[in-house]
Amino acid sequence: MKNVLKIIMALSLTTMLTSCGISFGVDSRRSSNWSSDSSSSLTSEEVNLSEDISDINKITMKIDVSDLNVIYHDGSNVEITGELSSYSKGVDINKSGSTFEIVEETTQSMNLGPNNYSELLIKIPRSFNGDLKLDFGVGSFNVSDLVLNNVEVKAGVGDVSLDGISFNSLDLESGVGSVSLVTKEKTGDIYISGGVGEVNVELGDINGNLKFDGGVGSADIKVPVDAPININSKSGLGDSNIKAKTSNEGKYTFDLEVGLGSVTVRN
């Protein structure tokens, strides 16, 4: 009976989540200027932008439909390169006080698919260690080896990968797709809200609390042996499997709420 209930809930939740366009960046399908025309006079073009951010302490990115990679480089400017989809309206950059904003918008069309995503590479100066905020619609998002202050990610439809990053706090809301978080150095407080898809977390040096609200799918969380954490888990229709060896110090708290799926914590 419990398995039957899980299946019913999975179908209901998946339908509900994938239909929530506002959360997942596909609300434009309901817009009055959404087009189902299979033809387009637009052609793809290259983007090559560069801007000094020496006086910036926060970068915000509002990305509509793109496969996006964000990395450090040894220059002093933010550099944005890549190829825009034929449906893209382009990339705009703007400075407002100490905030630098990057916006990519896409023409609304029923023909958008993986072959119509823009391909963007954003290089951030290695000297930048401020805040990063990303509001992501459709595509993939990959961040590698950044050292930041506060990180906020709102993902839509697609995979999210944060590899080798360090931060004082991370707030990640996933939509539909997989999430991968790998840290090697210091990390602060972490909040992850699961959507539909797998979540894989591998933590290095732990220096903060973790709160995980599971959605639909499995989660695997790897922590160091004898990590100074106290793990609390709450299961709804899902299952939790806590088998990590931790210390008795309990300096930080991991609060895990299992949605429809499973959560495993291991070394």
Feature locations, PLM:
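A structural signal for short hydrophobic beta-strand segments in well-ordered beta-sheet cores
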Residues: 61, 91-93, 256
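Mid-chain, structured segments of secreted extracytoplasmic proteins
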Residues: 90-110
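Short acidic/polar N-terminal linker immediately downstream of export determinants
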Residues: 4-7, 20-88, 107-127, 142, ...
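Short, surface-exposed interaction patches in beta-rich subdomains
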Residues: 46-49, 164-165, 169-173, 178-267
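Right-handed parallel beta-helix
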Residues: 133-175, 179
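Sec-dependent N-terminal signal peptides
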Residues: 7-13
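Hydrophobic residues embedded in beta-strands of well-ordered beta-sheets
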Residues: 78, 98-101, 263
